């Protein structure tokens, strides 16, 4: 028989801080240079034209424009930003027609 009560240790009692990953700006939304488009773990989304990628795989805009998502392959996606000049020209063409 034990002289002292055995002290157990809890395997719970820890919780990690939230990382707030995910898409921050969706397709068709206007972004300015430096805006974060999405935060991710690894490269599910790859940077396209006018888009940069940080050391933690954060994808951000390099120019002012509109966000555009596209399929790179069956599993991978590509994120582009269409600059403002091109967006304005397309709007003017629609208004004239």
Swiss-Prot record:
Look up keyword Acyltransferase and say if it applies.
no
> Which InterPro entries does this UniProt record tie to the protein?
Ribosomal_bL27 (IPR001684)
Identify one Pfam family in the record: Ribosomal_L27
User: Keywords on this record?
Assistant: Ribonucleoprotein, Ribosomal protein
Domain of life, per lineage: Bacteria
The UniProt entry's GO CC annotations, sorted and at most eight, read:
cytosolic large ribosomal subunit
Disordered: annotated segments = 1-21
Question: Where along the sequence do coiled-coil regions lie?
Answer: none
Recall the GO molecular function terms of this protein's record: structural constituent of ribosome
GO biological process per UniProt? translation
NCBIfam families attached to this UniProt entry: L27
State the family named in the UniProt similarity comment for this chain: Belongs to the bacterial ribosomal protein bL27 family.
PANTHER family attached to this UniProt entry: LARGE RIBOSOMAL SUBUNIT PROTEIN BL27M (PTHR15893:SF0), RIBOSOMAL PROTEIN L27 (PTHR15893)
Q: What is this protein called?
A: Large ribosomal subunit protein bL27
Organism field: Gemmatimonas aurantiaca (strain DSM 14586 / JCM 11422 / NBRC 100505 / T-27)
């Amino acid at each position: 028989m034990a002289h002292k009560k055995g002290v157990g240790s809890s395997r719970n009692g820890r919780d990690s801080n939230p990382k707030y990953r995910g898409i921050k700006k969706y397709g068709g939304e206007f972004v300015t240079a430096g805006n974060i488009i999405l935060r991710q773990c690894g490269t599910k989304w790859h940077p396209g034209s006018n888009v940069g990628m940080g050391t933690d795989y954060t994808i951000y805009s390099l120019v002012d424009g509109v966000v555009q998502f596209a399929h790179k392959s069956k599993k991978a996606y590509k994120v582009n930003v269409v600059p403002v000049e091109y967006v304005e020209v397309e709007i003017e063409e629609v208004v004239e027609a």
